[in-house]
Amino acid sequence: CGAERSLSSVLFLVALIFVVGTTAGVISAYAGGIVDIVIMRIADMMISFPGIILAIAISGIMGPSLINAMLALTVVTWTKYARLSRSLVLKLKESEFVEAAIVSGGTHTHILLHHILPNVLPLLVITAAADIGAMMMELAGLSFLGFGSQPPQPEWGLMLNEGRLQLQTAPWLMFFPGFAIFLSVVVFNLWGDALRDVLDPHQDQQ
């Protein structure tokens, strides 16, 4: 029915974007200097293009496949996490407990793993959870347009594309994949809100 491939693909996609973007942002903020300038200029360049249009262009160049569609979406989406993680790390670098760790002779690895990342990850995880629904829509959209999954792979976006050819005679071929996407997006959005309330309970109060 396409559920396993669709759900596992979008979860892997969000995890990939999370890792790439967060790593780039943390390195940019912590290293500073020319490294920060280069990474942020690349991010600014990527943001200047419409995301889905750029993803379609990259998928078209690389060739239609689910893996290439996921890589294309990663290329155009990592900047969000890079900029967010960078801003969080820059604030933490000026905090007293990080300065104390530096003065006490803590290594860069120790400071990153024990002082910076534990304070950065909760907000980034909330952001990632909230993005799952949007990424599902974009990945299904690429498959629907022919740039994602290819037959005979069962994936909801591809099933929508194939079902539209039988819309007059068998409308359920489009209804059920579409409803599955809709339901999954709603569930993931609600889950993201619940996760935000757990990891950041002061958000609503603010």
Question: Over which residues does each language-model region extend?
Answer:
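Alpha-helical transmembrane segments of integral membrane proteins
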Residues: 1-206
